[in-house]
Regions:
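Short, charged/polar, Gly/Pro-enriched secondary-structure boundary elements
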Residues: 57-61, 122-125
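Helix N-cap motif at beta-to-alpha junctions
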Residues: 21-22, 86-89
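Short, charged/polar surface micro-motifs in flexible loops or helix N-caps
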Residues: 56-59, 68-70, 88-90
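N-terminal beta-strand motif that seeds the catalytic metal site of vicinal oxygen chelate
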Residues: 2-24, 78-81, 131-134
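Short amphipathic alpha-helices within nucleic acid-binding modules
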Residues: 28, 89-94
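Vicinal oxygen chelate
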Residues: 2-8, 40, 51, 92-134
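Core segments of cupin and vicinal oxygen chelate
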Residues: 9, 16-58
Length: 134
């Protein structure tokens, strides 16, 4: 057996999250986080799929609704998705106007500030403002 070639994997393309309320979740990612809807489709098994991405990113989030898989359980080991934001304070104001508040932070780090917000279905989102003054 030969050595593993690390150049075989080129880049991360998407990650998938299963949800029970597709439209509420899509609304959060689009209206609160500002993601763009790339496409919608139905899988061969009947899953409803919506792909989203940040404006300056090629990586997509695949939101999936598939009732046959049973109830949604977000395990404690699934920690979060992280997004870079321009202005954390402005983001918090806009999110609050849409009914969402930060669940933790903002906190200063060596390279900026971070905060967290809870997405629908119990998924956690980390927000990172790089280069912010501590």
């Amino acid at each position: 057996m030969g050595a593993i070639r690390y150049d075989m994997v080129k880049k991360l393309l998407h990650t998938r999250y299963r949800v029970s309320d597709l439209e509420k979740t899509i609304s959060f990612y689009k209206d609160v986080l500002g993601l763009e809807e790339v496409r919608r489709q139905t899988s061969g098994r009947g899953s409803q799929l919506v792909f989203l991405k940040a404006p300056d990113s090629d990586v997509e989030i695949e939101i999936c609704k598939f009732d046959e898989s049973g109830p949604i359980v977000v395990g404690p080991d699934l920690t979060h998705l992280a997004f870079e934001v321009e202005d954390l304070d402005e983001f918090a104001k806009k999110a609050a106007a849409k009914g969402y508040s930060l669940s933790d932070g903002p906190h200063s780090t060596g390279s900026g500030r971070i905060a967290f917000i809870d997405a629908p279905e119990g998924y956690e989102i980390e927000l990172i403002e790089r280069g912010a003054k501590s």
